[in-house]
Amino acid sequence: MTTHSMSRREFARLFAMGGSAAILSHQTLLGSKPVRMTDPITSAGTVDWKTIRSQFLMPPELTVLNAANLCPSPAPVLETVYNYTKRLDSKPLPSFRAEMREVKEKTRQQLAKYLRVTPEEILITRNTSESNNWVSNGLDLRAGDEVVIFSDNHPSNNEAWKERGKRFGFTVNEVLPLNPHPGFDYYLEAFKKALTPRTRVLSFTHLSNTVGDLFPAKELCGMARKRGIITLIDGAQSLGLLDVDLSDIQPDFYSGSAHKWPCGPKETGVLFVNKSLQERFWPSIYSAYKGREGLAQTHEGLGQRDTPAIHAFGQQIEFLRKIGQEKIEERSGDIATEIIEELQKTKGVYIFTSNERALRSAVVTFRPANLEPAKVVKALEEDGIVATNLGGDDWAGVRFSPHFYNSNSDVERAVGAIRRYLRKGL
């Protein structure tokens, strides 16, 4: 395997750092990285992707292709978490805690603007898993009711419905995936056939975390709405990657996390709850320090929160808006296209992800001939390339999920490594 200037021990140390870890070794962690968001737009109106990449702590010799699992945060996000935590711990005055509650409301407004909805419809959660569970726990479902799910949803979505079905007696029916992506019409028809007069909820992923299949969210929500069926979109793989306009898609619920594609602080997330459904949605937790806007007044009582992280989440959302979410979606999709095109030239590689741009985005999963995916991912890590392996019978393979901070050279390094392993072995 190739040797890089960064040792494996150093790589492991850097990779393990994240979020509030900045507090532990502040100067070492930030180094010479900027502590204010640098304007990524040039005088010509184009995006300077190199400037954006420079704001992340990742060393040049590290290629991170794992956005579908965990994205690094830029240095200014870590600086915000550090500064506000230090201030709170230095002088934990009641006035400052009140100020931090105002900061949470500002983040709510930023999220609402980003998703094109109202602040009254935004709940700030800890991640997609919590958001999904709030939904499955907060709806009145009983014996005889049915919930339709996509079987390739994340476990935090599917398992929650199944376990509550056992408890309350409702039935959970699944729509199975088909590979390669059969097209939007196929899935619209498959979900339509699964709906019955007893169906109360339709829960599906916006973009699958396995092979990166994109789903016709607006059309599925419209179909369900005509039948009086509640919709939950798991947006863990679309928030921060796709240009999500919930005012256009019109779901009843939409969940997402900051730690993936938004590149935000860890353990912050969002749940959108459509105004039309709020009276039918019960809180899952009752405690203090609720929000001030809309549904947050009753549903966001989680007690003490990591308010510095919530503040940093809002700042990162503003940074994404400054770049332009449509440009981020295009950039990430272009890099994924390049990965697919290069893998197609590689003998022995089978690509699970659709080659058709309209049916996917930036999640690329492939089988590297007869090599064991877990061993391939381990070899990639030793070569300074971060990826994920998927298990199971259906999608056993390696997953590359590039983001806007990646470049063509990252594609060359990653695909070059795969070709080398196939040629020489692991």
Model features per residue range: what roles?
Residues 2, 7-426:
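Pyridoxal 5′-phosphate
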